[in-house]
């Protein structure tokens, strides 16, 4: 079973490398949002520093959401998704490999580039470890929850708006905990409580969402 997971993970990685625009779009979006915000609110460093925890997390959330609409699109259109559903291997395991590959090449890249843009907003260097850890724990949850919506809307021609309406309410706890951890660190308070809750959400999402994604794909393929 682990061999199948590894093979599918490698396959998805190769496919993503062939479509560099899909990898670059959310990262460019994240960078543009962060770069434009100081132009909108003014150059006051104290104001930017105060707003930076929420801004970084909202930009990351929207960047992840932007990348999810086409997550299963190509597999659905070329018939690969039907083969997945008919495969003797657990569909939940197959979709977990696909979502993991997506996160490794988009979500993880976003996590790694976030300190640079956070420093641009005046976030102190002492807060960077909390920023990295919160995004490292939170962005997989965003990808997994978003994949549930992507699975349900993959058969729709214009499912982007519906995907956002379905998934954004589910993102609220992650947004509150992630930005809360960063805000606590900015104020010199312990952020371990927020991070532990984020870790719990990550474990819960890894356990439950693959089955929800598999069920959503079966519904979409069967329509």
Curated annotation (Swiss-Prot):
<keyword id="KW-1133">Transmembrane helix</keyword>
<keyword id="KW-1003">Cell membrane</keyword>
<dbReference type="Pfam" id="PF03379">
    <property type="entry name" value="CcmB"/>
</dbReference>
<dbReference type="InterPro" id="IPR003544">
    <property type="entry name" value="Cyt_c_biogenesis_CcmB"/>
</dbReference>
<comment type="similarity">
    <text>Belongs to the CcmB/CycW/HelB family.</text>
</comment>
<feature type="transmembrane region" description="Helical">
    <location>
        <begin position="195"/>
        <end position="215"/>
    </location>
</feature>
<dbReference type="GO" id="GO:0005886">
    <property type="term" value="C:plasma membrane"/>
</dbReference>
<feature type="transmembrane region" description="Helical">
    <location>
        <begin position="52"/>
        <end position="72"/>
    </location>
</feature>
<keyword id="KW-0472">Membrane</keyword>
<keyword id="KW-0812">Transmembrane</keyword>
<dbReference type="GO" id="GO:0017004">
    <property type="term" value="P:cytochrome complex assembly"/>
</dbReference>
<dbReference type="InterPro" id="IPR026031">
    <property type="entry name" value="Cyt_c_CcmB_bac"/>
</dbReference>
<feature type="transmembrane region" description="Helical">
    <location>
        <begin position="103"/>
        <end position="123"/>
    </location>
</feature>
<feature type="transmembrane region" description="Helical">
    <location>
        <begin position="128"/>
        <end position="148"/>
    </location>
</feature>
<protein>
    <recommendedName>
        <fullName>Heme exporter protein B</fullName>
    </recommendedName>
</protein>
<keyword id="KW-0997">Cell inner membrane</keyword>
<feature type="transmembrane region" description="Helical">
    <location>
        <begin position="161"/>
        <end position="181"/>
    </location>
</feature>
<comment type="function">
    <text>Required for the export of heme to the periplasm for the biogenesis of c-type cytochromes.</text>
</comment>
<keyword id="KW-0813">Transport</keyword>
<dbReference type="GO" id="GO:1903607">
    <property type="term" value="P:cytochrome c biosynthetic process"/>
</dbReference>
<keyword id="KW-0201">Cytochrome c-type biogenesis</keyword>
<dbReference type="GO" id="GO:0015232">
    <property type="term" value="F:heme transmembrane transporter activity"/>
</dbReference>
<feature type="transmembrane region" description="Helical">
    <location>
        <begin position="23"/>
        <end position="43"/>
    </location>
</feature>
């Amino acid at each position: 079973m682990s061999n199948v997971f590894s093979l599918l993970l490698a396959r998805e990685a190769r496919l993503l490398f062939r479509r560099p625009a899909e990898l670059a779009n959310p990262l460019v979006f994240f960078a543009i949002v962060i770069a434009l915000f100081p132009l909108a609110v003014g150059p006051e460093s104290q104001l930017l520093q105060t707003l930076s925890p929420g801004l970084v997390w909202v930009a990351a959330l929207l960047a992840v959401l932007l990348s999810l609409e086409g997550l299963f699109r190509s597999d659905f259109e070329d018939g690969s998704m039907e083969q997945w559903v008919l495969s003797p291997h657990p569909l939940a395991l197959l979709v977990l490999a696909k979502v993991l590959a997506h996160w490794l090449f988009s979500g993880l890249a976003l996590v790694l580039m976030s300190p640079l843009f956070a420093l641009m907003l005046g976030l102190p260097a002492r807060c960077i470890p909390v920023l990295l850890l919160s995004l490292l724990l939170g962005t997989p949850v965003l990808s997994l929850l978003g994949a549930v919506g992507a699975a349900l809307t993959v058969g729709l021609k214009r499912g982007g708006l519906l995907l956002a309406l379905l998934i954004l309410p589910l993102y609220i706890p992650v947004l509150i905990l992630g930005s809360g951890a960063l805000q606590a660190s900015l104020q010199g308070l312990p952020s371990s409580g927020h991070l532990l809750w984020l870790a719990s959400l990550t474990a819960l999402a890894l356990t439950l969402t693959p089955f929800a994604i598999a069920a959503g794909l079966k519904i979409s393929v069967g329509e």
